[in-house]
């Protein structure tokens, strides 16, 4: 399964009913929609999947619904970040038991660990399971903890299961180059809403793992790049850059993403669980204007 961990992995939000319950039909519809977009796989229960707001039972429900809808030949990566090593191991084992192709793990933020502590944490998780661990390097989500290039390279050298990186430490293209130079065997995914996807590819990334609500656009960029049509990839990227930038605004990116999926008829409501940053009518009007200008209103194809 590790050979399939490349290309575009769309990170999906967790759909809720208006009363806050998991919306099973929307989870299935979102999975079908994402697969139909042509992505290489999906990632669930990440930061914008509101994983921290779910109970253990709800995590299992989302995993079961997604993995069943995806089918056995479509890889699902599951976020299993936890503040403690034992907790992360338990979540990762559970994801493997339920059929996950890989897990995604960010640094445990409460302990403010150094490189040695992070090495021990990740090795313990990797040794406890038989599937790849995507190391998430995203300082804003973990209290500012930054992973050094040496640590990342060392993780990949220690075991092939840790030779996967979701790099979101800005400026990401520069760090892609640095990690590639330190350990060329590491498979690097970009993130950050896709904002630097083209540049990350230029610097050696193998794809992107992010939640942009028009995954078919990221797929088109990636396929053009993979075919050798670098100008074509750039043309697509620069056309849709305004939307990528708009959707990935700090604090409101979750709300915007859910509103877009709702407008596209993929999820029944844009409901997020409290606490979250809502968007106002003016921002939604800006979104509608942008979608109209890019011919991306509901029912249209990118």
Where are these regions (language model features)?
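Short, low-complexity, intrinsically disordered N-terminal peptides in bacterial proteins
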Residues: 1-4, 300-302
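Active-site beta->alpha loop and helix N-cap motifs at the rims of alpha/beta catalytic domains
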Residues: 2-146, 154, 261
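C-terminal alpha-helical cap/extension of soluble enzyme domains
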Residues: 9-14, 37, 202-205, 213-302
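Short, amphipathic alpha-helical "lid/cap" segments that border enzyme active or binding sites
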Residues: 24, 28-31, 149, 284-291
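A general structural signal for well-ordered alpha-helical segments in protein cores
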Residues: 27, 59, 63, 88, ...
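Catalytic alpha/beta core domains of metabolic enzymes, predominantly
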Residues: 139-249
């Amino acid at each position: 399964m590790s050979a399939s961990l490349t290309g575009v992995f769309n990170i999906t939000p967790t759909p809720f009913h208006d009363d806050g319950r998991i919306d099973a039909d929307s989870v299935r519809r979102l999975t079908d929609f994402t697969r139909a977009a042509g992505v290489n796989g999906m990632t669930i229960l990440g930061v914008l999947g509101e994983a921290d707001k779910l109970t253990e039972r709800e995590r299992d429900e989302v995993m079961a619904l997604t993995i069943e809808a995806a089918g056995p030949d479509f890889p699902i990566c599951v976020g299993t970040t936890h503040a403690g090593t034992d907790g992360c191991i338990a979540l990762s084992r559970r994801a493997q038991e339920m059929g996950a192709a890989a897990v995604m793990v960010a640094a445990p933020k409460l302990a403010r660990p150094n490189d040695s502590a992070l090495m021990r944490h990740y090795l313990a998780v990797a040794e406890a399971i038989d599937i790849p661990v995507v190391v998430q390097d995203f300082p804003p989500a973990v209290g500012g903890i930054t992973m050094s290039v040496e640590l990342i390279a060392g993780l990949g050298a220690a075991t092939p299961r840790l030779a996967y990186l979701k790099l979101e430490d800005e400026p990401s293209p520069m760090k892609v180059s640095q990690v590639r130079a330190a350990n060329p065997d590491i498979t690097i995914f970009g993130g950050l809403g896709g904002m630097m996807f083209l540049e990350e590819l230029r610097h050696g990334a193998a794809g992107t793992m992010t939640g942009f609500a028009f995954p078919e656009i990221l797929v088109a960029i990636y396929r053009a790049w993979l075919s050798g049509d670098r100008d074509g990839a750039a043309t697509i990227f620069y056309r849709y850059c305004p939307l990528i930038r708009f959707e990935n605004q700090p604090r409101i990116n979750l709300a915007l993403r859910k509103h877009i999926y709702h407008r596209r008829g993929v999820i029944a409501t844009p409901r997020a669980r409290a606490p979250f940053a809502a968007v106002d009518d003016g921002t939604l009007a800006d979104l509608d204007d942008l979608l109209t200008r890019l011919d991306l209103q509901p029912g249209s194809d990118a």
